Amino acid sequence: MDIQQNKTNKQKKKRNRFIFRSSILLILVAAVVFAIVSNMKDDNKIYRVGDAAPDFQLKQISEEVDQSTVQLSDLEGKGVMLNFWATWCDPCKAEMPYMQDLYAEYKEKGVEIVAVSLDGTELVVDQFIDEYDLTFPVPHDKNGEVKDLYKIGPMPTTYFIKPNGEIEEIVQGALTLDRLEGYLNDIAPQQN
């Protein structure tokens, strides 16, 4: 009987291990399915040309600008160039002088340039603003919330937004002066 009882005990242990392992596997599969379904929700939308640009509000760094925050919805009725950049990004540095050169002219035409800094600290951004004599709004996305909202990958990335809030164009990489001017013309409010 000892042999029979030993066999029965081994079978019970095997069955218990099988049930335990199956339960763990089922829990893991359920967790993976939940994670996939959660990531498919609308808050993970990738914005494309023709979509409405999502609203945001960020603290303003540039002292040249009157307001202390920049909120996209406050610029309704104007064309908006929304540029995502960082001080360590060489292509970003290359296009900043073009943006500054065109800012005053296009501000009069109803186009606002907003350069969202993705740097970690305000100090480096403030020094950059002084070095390049930037006079357009430079809000700071310290925590990356707006970067995540717009799904920004490579820098610079620029959204050109029509006066009605619709995305006209998305450009990844540095802009030349000619391309920049062309896009700014495309989003300028129509003069009647």
From Swiss-Prot:
Q: Which InterPro entries match?
A: AhpC/TSA, Thiol-dS_OxRdtase_ResA, Thioredoxin-like_sf, Thioredoxin_domain, Thioredoxin_ResA/DsbE_sf
Q: In which pathway does it act?
A: Protein modification; cytochrome c assembly
User: What kind of membrane protein is this, topologically?
Assistant: Single-pass type II membrane protein
Specify the Thioredoxin domain's residue ranges: 47-189
Where in or outside the cell it occurs: the entry states:
Cell membrane
Q: Quote the NCBIfam families the UniProt record gives.
A: PRK03147.1
Q: Please identify the protein, giving its name as recorded.
A: Thiol-disulfide oxidoreductase ResA
Report the source organism. Answer: Oceanobacillus iheyensis (strain DSM 14371 / CIP 107618 / JCM 11309 / KCTC 3954 / HTE831)
